[in-house]
Amino acid sequence: MGGNVMTDDKMNSVTSGANKQETGRDMSNRDWWPNHLKLEILHQHSSKSNPMGEDFNYAKEFKSLDLAAVKKDLAALMTDSQDWWPADFGHYGPLFIRMAWHSAGTYRAGDGRGGGGRGQQRFAPLNSWPDNVNLDKARRLLWPIKQKYGRKISWADLMILTGNVAMETMGFKTFGFGGGREDVWEPDQDVYWGSEDTWLGDERYTGDRDLENPLAAVQMGLIYVNPEGPNGNPDPIAAAKDIREVFARMAMNDEETVALIAGGHAFGKTHGAGPASHVGPEPEAASIEAQGLGWKSSFGTGKGDDTITGGLEVTWTNTPTKWSNNFFRILFGYEWELTKSPAGAYQWKPKGGAGAGTIPDAHDPSKRHAPSMMTTDLSLRFDPVYEKISRHFYENPGQLADSFARAWFKLTHRDMGPRARYLGPEVPAEELIWQDPIPAVNHELIDEKDIAFLKDRILASGLSISQLVSTAWVSASTFRGSDKRGGANGARIRLAPQKDWEVNQPAELAKVLNTLEGIQSEFNSAASGGKKVSLADLIVLAGCAGVEQAAKNAGYDVTVPFLPGRMDALQEQTDVVSFALLEPIADGFRNYLKAQYPLPAEELLVDKAQLLTLTAPEMTVLVGGMRVLNTNFGHTQHGVFTQKPEALTNDFFVNLLDMGTEWKAVSDVKDIFEGCDRKTGEVKWTGTRVDLIFGSNSQLRALAEVYGSADAQEKFVQDFVAAWTKVMNLDRFDLA
């Protein structure tokens, strides 16, 4: 036994782990197998990490909040300067604007991820990004107010609200505020911030400065652009290209971009009092006694006039705590020459010493300075498109104020989804096209008798189960849980651009919609008492009818839950450019790939499942069901592992797990595979990477085994119906 006896230390996993931390780090499955499928993103933000309990209703709590009292407390905080982190110019407003901006500004329109909707600035990596230096202090300054109001206001809402109050206390009229951002309690795992492994790395570019999708920042750890210019090159014209690219990826046009930069830089200053070598580790790397505060500086006092944040030392205007048009007055009022901050960062000053003594010091009333600008500020003057807009704003300050108010509201609410999700007394009445408006219900809804009648009409229409299910799926599955856009409500599948997307098979879609519109017209004409059915409802109902019939074909009578209340959006309520970003490049649920991508198809499936807020079991049962319902793009038979298509059986799993089948790639690309009889070599099935991953990946195989078991058919049908219903209702915020 002597050679096998374990010492106490070896047996004690805690002690062993502690020793391990001193010599190295524990190896995760992903360290061993870098291509390991990242299924954990389907299970983030579960109840196990949430301290609030299953009965907690944030919307209800927020509605009970005295918002005016919160704003009064925030207004008092703005000028309550603390010795441990004194306010520039005696006002914390500019710091809080930066906090709110950097909370919301991580949003990118490409996949809807990022943004301020979940309070992620509290967690890694955002809490430790180089662009967020010293925002930890802003949140600590807010803690007494958060502590006072507790569960009634989330950190996510409080950070955005504080940015609004900051502006209002400095004389700016904001456009409004909508609450409803519910906090999460762990870092997001689904957001791809880039492949770089060093701060400020920029391996995200290829070719002629082509930025990788869906990224919306030029370097790892920045919110947008490098203020010194591309890679620190102080070229305002080149910087303008970066600005235009990343702001567009945040869904901002040129006018909104100029308004945001100029409006934001009406306030406050940047901080570059000394070399960055004086700055200590970021919050996530700081010592335990720092209690989550980072970037402790050894330069002078480390605060006040000695603060080092981004390295630039720029104060844009002579009125840094008062709303004005002085940013443009100063930008156009001087000729500029390149200089460096005390930290060594490139910035600009007026030529010939002009403007000396016109800018106040942030902490010493006896000191005065010259104006200064960043390279990216000068982009607004020297890029010809930006210059025209900037000149217009300079000459029309009222237009700047309105454009900035609207752009700021869009910046801080873009990831919240439809206006129906906004809470509180300051929600603006105006409906904005980027909110993807849908008309309010203006008619009596169909009842159970009507639903049964319409199902019968649909099933007798000549449309196949595959057509009914596919159409409902492509309508509903545009939903993104990230920014709450897309979904079946609005029936935008019949409008540009969605009606022409390849994934929707436009010719077949038009046939299905024409048939359903005929049924809709017939019903609405015959109905009395103002009762109507919207096409949005009818599309979903048709899919539900198809699923019910498929279950019946498999020997099971089920009723798929259906709740009417969707409405049909108009083309003029649909921003074509914005909606184009929702076009799927892949839909593994229908075995669709628009092109070959660097990421394998199975990763794209998981990504879409995450955007649909699906769990791994829900993803699994939906793929298995969609295959046997014959819903593949182009009617391919890849993954249709059944002899009874359009019957809701568990055949996909039974046949995938059949050890009598051997799988072989048909080409070196390894995207299509043939399943051959091990004995005869006869080809039985064909499948894609998405199909085979449910037998290859150990976690997904475990789930497939559940649904492929002899006693699993009824469970499979029930679970498919539940997951299907979830997808159909993802955008039904009116039901919450």
UniProtKB/Swiss-Prot annotation:
Active site: 102
A Pfam family matched in the record: peroxidase
Name assigned to this protein: Catalase-peroxidase
GO molecular function, one term: metal ion binding
Residues noted as binding heme b in the record, renumbered to the chain: 265
CDD domains the record matches: catalase_peroxidase_1, catalase_peroxidase_2
Crosslink feature (Tryptophyl-tyrosyl-methioninium (Trp-Tyr) (with M-250)) location: 101-224
Annotated segments matching region Disordered: 1-30, 351-373
SUPFAM superfamilies: Heme-dependent peroxidases (SSF48113)
InterPro entries in the cross-refs: Catalase_peroxidase (IPR000763), Haem_peroxidase (IPR002016), Haem_peroxidase_sf (IPR010255), Peroxidases_AS (IPR019794), Peroxidases_heam-ligand_BS (IPR019793)
Cofactor info, note text: Binds 1 heme b (iron(II)-protoporphyrin IX) group per dimer.
